[in-house]
Amino acid sequence: MRQYLQLLEDILENGVEKEDRTGVGTLSVFGRQLRFNLQDGFPLVTTKKLHIRSIIYELLWFLKGDTNVRYLQENGVTIWDEWADENGDLGPVYGAQWRSWKGADGKTVDQIASVVEEIKRNPNSRRLLVNAWNVAELDKMKLPPCHYAFQFYVANGRLSCMWQQRSVDTFLGLPFNIASYALLTHMIAEQCGLDVGELIFTGGDVHLYKNHIEQAKLQLTREPRPLPKLVLKRKPSSIFDYEYDDFEIVGYDPHPTIKAPVAV
């Protein structure tokens, strides 16, 4: 995960000061890419401890098509609480767009089911794409998608994934995003009888909030440790039937947690 640390250094050295929606302010760079070979291990940042439970339950929540934080809260995950309304609703965010994209004709599209089926049927397709940036529904969302699209690519029996992210909270958010898309790639690869290949992140406005700068500098003093391995303990009949206990992270030995405030 040294490439992640190099991105932190890049922002600290080259970032432009910008004001932002949250009022916190950022150091920002534009247009950055990271690549991870999933054969080398599961890409969990080791220079600080990540809350794996939140990463797994959030992805399962997305895949359920759920947009209310109740499921997350029942499972000890609070990462979406700041944006939810008094009933726990977030509007048509990721889960709604992934599982029930509303078209102009009023019909809905299950993009996840469609892309899994297409990978199985036509792995050479260049249309293995899921999009969460539904312009017609952005104003109904409590937070428009930061990671707004992802594409799969099959070659030599391996499934690779590239995701696009318009806005990147590099200290708090990006380590979660990396792990989440790695997990999704492993799950879909298993469902499609494939091995995993490469995970690629492409970011637009890639930034450090000003109240994360000292934490990032602390993280840069730490030496990365070996990556853990992901074990999928069973193969469910569907991508939608995975449960929390189906996943095991083996050999995760991170440095201690570094606390930082969330910019809302």
From Swiss-Prot:
EC number, as in UniProt: 2.1.1.45
Binding site for dUMP: R21, R126, R127, R166, S167, V168, D169, N177, H207, L208, Y209
GO MF entry, a single one: thymidylate synthase activity
Cellular compartments per GO CC: cytosol
Main location: cytoplasm
GO-annotated biological processes: dTMP biosynthetic process; dTTP biosynthetic process; methylation
InterPro entries: Thymidate_synth/dCMP_Mease, Thymidate_synth/dCMP_Mease_dom, Thymidate_synth/dCMP_Mease_sf, Thymidylate_synthase, Thymidylate_synthase_AS
Keywords: Cytoplasm, Methyltransferase, Nucleotide biosynthesis, Transferase
Alphabetical list of Pfam families matching this protein: Thymidylat_synt
PANTHER family from the UniProt entry: THYMIDYLATE SYNTHASE, THYMIDYLATE SYNTHASE 1
Family, similarity comment: Belongs to the thymidylate synthase family. Bacterial-type ThyA subfamily.
Biological function: Catalyzes the reductive methylation of 2'-deoxyuridine-5'-monophosphate (dUMP) to 2'-deoxythymidine-5'-monophosphate (dTMP) while utilizing 5,10-methylenetetrahydrofolate (mTHF) as the methyl donor and reductant in the reaction, yielding dihydrofolate (DHF) as a by-product. This enzymatic reaction provides an intracellular de novo source of dTMP, an essential precursor for DNA biosynthesis.
Oligomer status and interactors: Homodimer.
Name under which the protein is recorded: Thymidylate synthase
Lineage of the species this protein comes from: Bacteria, Bacillati, Bacillota, Bacilli, Bacillales
